[in-house]
Amino acid sequence: MSQVRTVSDTKRDFYTHHTRPINSIFRRVVEELLVEMHLLSVNADFRYDPFYALGVVTSFERFMQGYRPEADKVSIFQSMCQAIGGDANRYKEDAMALVELAKRCSGTQLIECFRQDVPPEGAQELWEKIEAIAKNDHFKYSRLFAIGVYTFLGESEPQLLEDTEKRDEMLTTVTAGLNLPEEKMKKDLDLYRSNLEKMNQVLEVLEDALAVERQRREKAEAEAKAKTAEATVATETNDEQDEQKETSESGSDA
């Protein structure tokens, strides 16, 4: 019997793959997402699916927005996926494919896919994905799966997420169609939106602080340049005066 990997094992693997330091504000985001992915990966009932992939990719992109240097985000995401035995390219490709599928489906088709026992016209692919989840008695629900479904709905019908009443009605239909806990999913998504808002506020404060620091640094550099210029002018003036004095003294000696 193989030994179940621990959170420590996964974190160690992650930091082996990604060796650059991570900004302290974002380190908690990365580690919390990594732990969540790890716990699912070692759960016997968990099965990877495109909605989960979309949830992972969306969470990472939304919470890591504003990370610097931007190039490090690629390494961080790849290392997270590698640490749990996953493939970053597969996550991104499956997430992108699901987004494209969402854009091809109308709001009516979405609703019918979650309500009907047969696929509605033009939505066979989506219906099959939903049906596979609904018929899985051991389906492992997760917050990341919920975020994936939420993102999918938003890509198909953005106004669904802007109107609280319509959003709740749609989530009721979705959870019923997937045989998932409605209240749990709604609470998870409420927390997701709340955390996003808090993160955006933190980033705004950070950007303001960086702007102030940048202005202070630019002012200091400008003042330093001005002082250097003044010193240069003063030196040149003194040199000219010395030359004139020497010339005058030479003339007197003559």
Curated annotation (Swiss-Prot):
In terms of InterPro entries, this protein maps to: Thf1
Query: Might you report a single GO cellular component term?
Result: plasma membrane-derived thylakoid photosystem II
**Which keywords accompany this UniProt record?**
Coiled coil
Q: Which domain of life is it from?
A: Bacteria
**Keyword Transmembrane included in the entry's annotation:** no
Single GO biological process annotation from the record: photosystem II assembly
Task: Enumerate the HAMAP family for this protein.
Answer: Thf1
Q: What is this protein called?
A: Protein Thf1
